[in-house]
């Protein structure tokens, strides 16, 4: 667990290896979550129409942040890029950015930390 703000801003994330996603022409990311629970497979076999993937479309800001995550950029660098592109619309910047990154790391497992 990082001890201070500087350590938090130096965290580097990468997209999880097993995550599937699509990017459209407007740079909007759609996460594809495979639905392969045994109950879902069973109902598909008896011809229920259950999609194999759940599609989650991110908004403009989330998509921009997600596409910045490359295993090299720090949280601080991603924040600076976000502020350069969107200006005051993203303030309070790091509070919102860290909340989003924590959510897609801890709750969704879309990304993972590459450094401690």
Which residues are covered by each model-predicted region?
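Hydrophobic packing positions characteristic
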Residues: 1-38
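Long, charge-rich, low-complexity alpha-helical segments
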Residues: 2-15, 47-116
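Alpha-helical membrane-targeting segments
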Residues: 31, 35-55
């Amino acid at each position: 667990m990082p001890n201070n703000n500087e350590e938090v801003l130096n965290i580097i994330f990468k997209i999880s290896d097993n995550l599937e996603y699509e990017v459209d022409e407007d740079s909007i990311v759609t996460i594809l979550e495979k639905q392969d629970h045994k109950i879902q497979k069973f109902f598909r076999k008896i011809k229920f129409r259950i999609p194999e993937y759940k599609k989650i479309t991110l908004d403009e800001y989330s998509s921009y942040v997600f596409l910045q995550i490359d295993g090299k950029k720090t949280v601080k660098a991603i924040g600076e890029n976000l502020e350069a592109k969107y200006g005051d619309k993203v303030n309070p910047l790091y509070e919102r950015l860290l909340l989003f990154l924590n959510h897609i790391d801890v709750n969704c497992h879309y990304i993972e930390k590459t450094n401690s």
